[in-house]
Amino acid sequence: SRQWLFSTNHKDIGTLYFIFGAWAGMVGTSLSILIRAELGHPGALIGDDQIYNVIVTAHAFIMIFFMVMPIMIGGFGNWLVPLMLGAPDMAFPRMNNMSFWLLPPALSLLLVSSMVENGAGTGWTVYPPLSSGIAHGGASVDLAIFSLHLAGISSILGAVNFITTVINMRSTGITLDRMPLFVWSVVITALLLLLSLPVLAGAITMLLTDRNLNTSFFDPAGGGDPILYQHLFWFFGHPEVYILILPGFGMISHIISQESGKKETFGSLGMIYAMLAIGLLGFIVWAHHMFTVGMDVDTRAYFTSATMIIAVPTGIKIFSWLATLHGTQLSYSPAILWALGFVFLFTVGGLTGVVLANSSVDIILHDTYYVVAHFHYVLSMGAVFAIMAGFIHWYPLFTGLTLNNKWLKSQFIIMFIGVNLTFFPQHFLGLAGMPRRYSDYPDAYTTWNVVSTIGSTISLLGILFFFYIIWESLVSQRQVIYPIQLNSSIEWYQNTPPAEHSYSELPLLTN
């Protein structure tokens, strides 16, 4: 209907992002189950390494560009930023709509790329010469590049929109130092997107012309260098991983302070500076993904040290969350369970990151399952746990309905066991030298791979249970009578769900 297709309402567009992200998440999860099924026993299941690599590549692209980013930035960002700023809507409401509607064509292009020719079996990094016209002939990689172009344009437009909204549309009284941490996290994320995505666009456009127009940016035969591609890609790719986690940081800050019954997060100004520091440092560490290409020892020393420095502002955030929790009598609501799970598991993932920051160690562990375990701890148990926490926490605000808390707690336990069983053994596999992006392995690696695959099945059950819980809530229609929160953030002063136009008169906020 016209309301959805041509919407200029931040709430409706946010809801579209949630639905799109959930759908893409199911596709991405299905691909991950295929990966674990293939690795669940020695020997072949799919029987074709190209198809296996296409599945791995698509799993990464879908989870990053079509699940985490649309839900965190598009879903939570659109819904909450205007409400938390006391703004009537986003600064550019029609551009907001366009940002969303660029995503379904982008996802379609990605899915089509896997259905024509041989698919793009390059890994999400799309390194040449494997992604060149010789090793990957046909249209698949080109379609994947176009998909990334559209998703990138969508994100850049969204970033401009969020930055403008935050600069221009804050209510009187919301000074920058008093702006909610989630809004801060989104605006920092938007800045990172704005600065990093054009570099990715440049890299993949150069790859496109290398493949189709006979240029040789990345071809040594014509004076090019494949390492240039790696530098360009990772100059985008490292900020990207912070883009995936920063909005999660913002949500976790809100959830922990509200569930602790505190007025604000401990050290909220320090939290802002920490996020700014993470955003800045994220741009000057990219070559730690390239320790194995052969860099000078002093270059490696720099990237090792700079990478470890990121642990400092991250540690400030972890300990501030713990300080916020300090002295509270917690009632273990589902949202706080996810938030506590986030703090613990994100810390574990961060520690393995510090291990990998050591360039000499990384040369051994690069492209092994240790790296896979590291980034799935921070993404599958960082970003995803933050999404789960945020969704459960703000669901009553978004819908005016309540979820079944007892079921949500069981679902948390199932999911917690599932993801840890899936990814913890991968540390052992990596230390034992099992390489990434292979569809088979020597028998010695069987045991932990079987454990990992069992874990992925448990996770799948947890996700299906979650969708059932949401369905049950929607059909039961248990209305929220009044929010039980201590209103530490102004979005809770809305009706549940908020009126279509939340702030007809601009609010005046005083201390």
Swiss-Prot record:
Binding site for Fe(II)-heme a: 59, 376
Domain of life: Eukaryota
Residues holding Ca(2+): 38, 43
Principal subcellular localisation of the protein: mitochondrion
Biological process according to GO: electron transport coupled proton transport; mitochondrial electron transport, cytochrome c to oxygen
Pathway noted in the entry: Energy metabolism; oxidative phosphorylation
TM region(s), chain numbering: 15-35, 54-74, 100-120, 143-163, 181-201, 232-252, 266-286, 303-323, 336-356, 378-398, 412-432, 450-470
Cofactor(s) demanded: heme; Cu cation
Cross-link (1'-histidyl-3'-tyrosine (His-Tyr)): 238-242
Binding site for heme a3: 374
Listed GO CC annotations: mitochondrial inner membrane; respiratory chain complex IV
EC number in record: 7.1.1.9
Residues annotated for Mg(2+) binding in this entry: 366-367
Compartments where found: Mitochondrion inner membrane
Binding site for Cu cation: 238, 288-289
Cofactor note: Binds 2 heme A groups non-covalently per subunit. Binds a copper B center.
Its membrane topology: Multi-pass membrane protein
Top EC group: translocase
Catalysed conversion reaction: 4 Fe(II)-[cytochrome c] + O2 + 8 H(+)(in) = 4 Fe(III)-[cytochrome c] + 2 H2O + 4 H(+)(out)
Binding site for O2: 242
Role: Component of the cytochrome c oxidase, the last enzyme in the mitochondrial electron transport chain which drives oxidative phosphorylation. The respiratory chain contains 3 multisubunit complexes succinate dehydrogenase (complex II, CII), ubiquinol-cytochrome c oxidoreductase (cytochrome b-c1 complex, complex III, CIII) and cytochrome c oxidase (complex IV, CIV), that cooperate to transfer electrons derived from NADH and succinate to molecular oxygen, creating an electrochemical gradient over the inner membrane that drives transmembrane transport and the ATP synthase.
Subunit description: Component of the cytochrome c oxidase (complex IV, CIV), a multisubunit enzyme composed of a catalytic core of 3 subunits and several supernumerary subunits. The complex exists as a monomer or a dimer and forms supercomplexes (SCs) in the inner mitochondrial membrane with ubiquinol-cytochrome c oxidoreductase (cytochrome b-c1 complex, complex III, CIII).
Protein name: Cytochrome c oxidase subunit 1
The species this protein was found in: Drosophila yakuba (Fruit fly)
Gene expressing this chain: mt:CoI
